[in-house]
Design a protein with these regions (language model features):
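Short, small-residue-enriched loops and turns at beta-alpha junctions
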Residues: 52-53, 85-90, 174
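Glycine-rich, highly charged phosphate/nucleotide-binding loops
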Residues: 58-72
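Short, conserved beta-strand segments within well-ordered enzyme catalytic domains
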Residues: 30-32, 44, 78-80, 140, ...
Length: 239
């Protein structure tokens, strides 16, 4: 008789902050994934220990369960995923799996059986609306990628599409092969981006550091309301 073994995507993590008040609005839990593909790394990066993909600790099914238990506490209103780089190709499967699970459990959404990566709001008419409001866990994603919105409208189609670029200005790219590598798996990257509540985008730029800013380190970074941006077809920021 063989024993069923649960598996999670092969990512690693640097640390878990059980009570986080700095990486998003309200009290939350923060996951710092391991590995950052950007070269060179951000000058004076806050988390240089997260650069190496082979460092950190293994993200096992047991660790994932413990992380979800931390989220389950009623006073936790937010989950933040940082790094490292959560949208690095090496981290996409694990981050997508976690975001999907959080939405299923806490945001009263369910996975579309025709497309396991696409999340849609549950149509259950018996849902307790009071509990719905109190149980929602906002998902914040911090990424060095720059969010671009493509919007098209016609008689038959009204569509908002997220594109995530590894550099805000492609003129700074020295190695085209490196740029292509950073753009691999864009579909998964887009799925993650469209499934969270807020994205803090852009690489940290030390010369634009501003300690007066909320939830980010430099003025080039933006706090984007994802779902509102999808509705309006343009980038909507909190500030």
């Amino acid at each position: 008789m063989t024993k069923n073994i649960r598996k999670v995507s092969n990512i690693r993590y640097a640390s878990i902050r059980e009570m986080d008040i700095s990486n998003g609005e309200g009290v939350g839990v923060a996951l710092f994934v391991q590995g950052c593909p950007f070269n060179p790394h951000c000058y004076n990066c806050f988390n240089p220990d997260t650069w190496d993909f082979n460092s950190g600790k293994e993200w096992t099914p047991e660790i994932k369960d413990k992380f979800l238990e931390l989220i389950d506490r009623p006073y936790i209103k937010r989950v933040s995923i940082l790094g490292g780089e959560p949208l690095a190709s090496e981290n996409l499967d694990g981050v997508l799996d976690l975001v999907t699970e959080i939405n299923k459990r806490y945001n009263f959404q369910k996975v579309d059986s025709a497309n396991p990566c696409k999340i849609r709001v549950s149509e259950d008419k018996n849902t307790d609306k009071i509990r719905l409001l109190s149980s929602h866990k906002n998902i914040w994603l911090y990424t060095g990628y720059k969010l671009i919105i493509d919007y098209s409208e016609s008689k038959r189609q009204r569509k908002t599409v997220f594109t995530l670029l590894p550099y805000a200005n492609t003129n700074v790219v020295n190695d085209i092969n490196e740029y292509r590598m950073l753009c691999e798996n864009d579909d998964k990257r887009r799925m993650i981006a469209e499934s969270v509540d807020f994205i803090v985008d852009g690489r940290y730029i030390d010369s634009q550091r501003d300690i007066s800013l909320k939830w980010r380190g430099s003025s080039n970074q933006r706090v984007i309301s994802v779902q509102e941006s999808l509705k309006q077809g343009k980038v909507i920021t909190l500030e």
